[in-house]
């Protein structure tokens, strides 16, 4: 078992990974034992190569245990590498907080699409998550589908932290990219007349150009969603 007294969530994530890739348990322990930002950032970058990107595929007991630690949303889209990267970020937040901003900024700028997606999936797990709003907003403006999907789907961060105009823009971006609105955490509570009107315009534009409107546009019906 990976034990980290100051970082129980990180320890739990690493244990989940170690169960799935037991040959890498020693590496996970080695990195966790020396949680300086340089070591953690290197491990973050190497996660896919060392562990692969197979689905995390949690069972019911594992989901319940994570929920007890505050992770009560779906991790169905997470890979083993995503869980590991989330653990390294949480360790950096708990043990090297002064260096966390640089860590995140370097990975956001230099990491591949999978690393950037992992950053976004991990944002809700970080203390004082609101401070990373600019990182999420920058991803919203990007054009890499995998990165946008990590922000839109099964991620409570936007509904919790985005202001109305930014949240609405994200929903419209999701519609344009044909991402499933059913996987937007907290969408129902954030639907406004303004958003419903904008979504109706998207549908009208699609029909006018001979394209099918998004299948789950009904979720944005004002007073219904």
Annotated model-derived regions:
Residues 80-198:
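Eukaryote-skewed repeat-based solenoidal scaffolds used as protein-protein interaction platforms
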Residues 1-94, 165-225:
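N-terminal alpha-helical scaffold/docking segments in eukaryotic complex subunits
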């Amino acid at each position: 078992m990976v034990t980290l007294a100051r970082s129980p969530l990180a320890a739990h994530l690493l244990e989940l990974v170690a169960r799935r890739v037991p040959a890498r348990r020693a590496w996970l322990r080695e990195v966790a034992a020396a949680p300086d930002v340089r070591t953690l950032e290197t491990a973050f970058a190497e996660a896919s190569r060392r562990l692969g990107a197979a689905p995390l595929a949690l069972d019911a007991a594992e989901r319940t245990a994570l929920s007890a630690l505050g992770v009560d949303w779906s991790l169905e889209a997470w890979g083993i590498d995503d869980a590991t990267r989330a653990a390294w970020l949480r360790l950096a937040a708990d043990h090297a907080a002064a260096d966390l901003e640089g860590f995140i900024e370097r990975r956001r700028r230099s990491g591949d699409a999978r690393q950037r997606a992992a950053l976004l999936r991990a944002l809700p797990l970080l203390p004082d998550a609101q401070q990373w709003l600019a990182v999420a907003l920058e991803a919203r403006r990007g054009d890499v589908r995998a990165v946008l999907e990590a922000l839109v789907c099964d991620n409570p961060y936007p509904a919790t932290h985005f202001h109305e105009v930014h949240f609405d823009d994200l929903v419209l971006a999701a519609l344009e990219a044909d991402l499933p609105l059913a996987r937007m955490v907290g969408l129902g509570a954030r639907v406004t007349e303004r958003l419903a009107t904008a979504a109706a315009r998207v549908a009208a534009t699609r029909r006018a150009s001979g394209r099918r409107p998004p299948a789950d546009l009904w979720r944005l019906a004002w007073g219904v969603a």
